[in-house]
Amino acid sequence: MYHYQQGQKAHEGTGGLNILYLGFAGRIVKGLSVGANIGYLFGTTYNDVYAHTNTSSTSLFEQIIQVRDYHLDFGIQYRLEINRRHALSAGLTYSPGKTLLGHTWVQKYDINSDAAPDTIGYASIRNRFSIPDTWGAGIAYEWNRALFVEADFTYQPWSKAKIGHQEDFTSTTFCDRYRVGLGAAYTPAQRGGYLRRITYRLGGHWARDYMEIGTNHVREYGLSCGFGFPAPGGKTVINLGFDWIHRSCTPQALVTENYFNIRLGVNFNQLWFMQSKLR
């Protein structure tokens, strides 16, 4: 914790966490599949407090949190083929919570001076910052290998997570997070003209976020649409998606945010390194 004289303050935050992972999946018996993701969690966040005192001096207190850790996800899915045209699927996912590994420290800058910053309180974040378990469940309906409709639910008990000390954010606490999603994807034909082989996607979601400001919860809802463009050869799909997300506080509308995201991804379905067999 750091202190300064009476005056005005301004806050600014940047950064975030990223994950790089490898996924593995396989079928145990007919209709039953299991999978797992092994990920590397990394990133840096910056919480800046600008302090302007009554003596006309300005200081910057920058709290830096650097994370370097692993992350695991597990899943199981069962698929029931009712007949040649209709199928149902149900799945469960679980990601274990854990204390985060990394370091945190504060750097103090004197804005009115060119002097090097002072480093305050360099320490490990182990047992001070953590992420909770994540539970997920979903059901899906498939028609004629062309139409997919899916609903899913996600729960994260953020109220049990550790977040350490955040300067001037004592009124902000964490609460459990819920998310409900519904989406559909339609591919007119697996073969034929190119436009008929494009996959069209549409979905929406509602969530109660994990932040609680005083007695106000953060609500979020959004809509998304996208397309899957098959590449020549049919083994690779280029995915383009658009998201609109609205976030606001309730019962008091403290802050209202609107986001528009564009997503681009590639799915590789080629059986690399596998030699063809003569029959």
Residue ranges and their predicted role:
Residues M1-R279:
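Outer-membrane beta-barrel porins/channels
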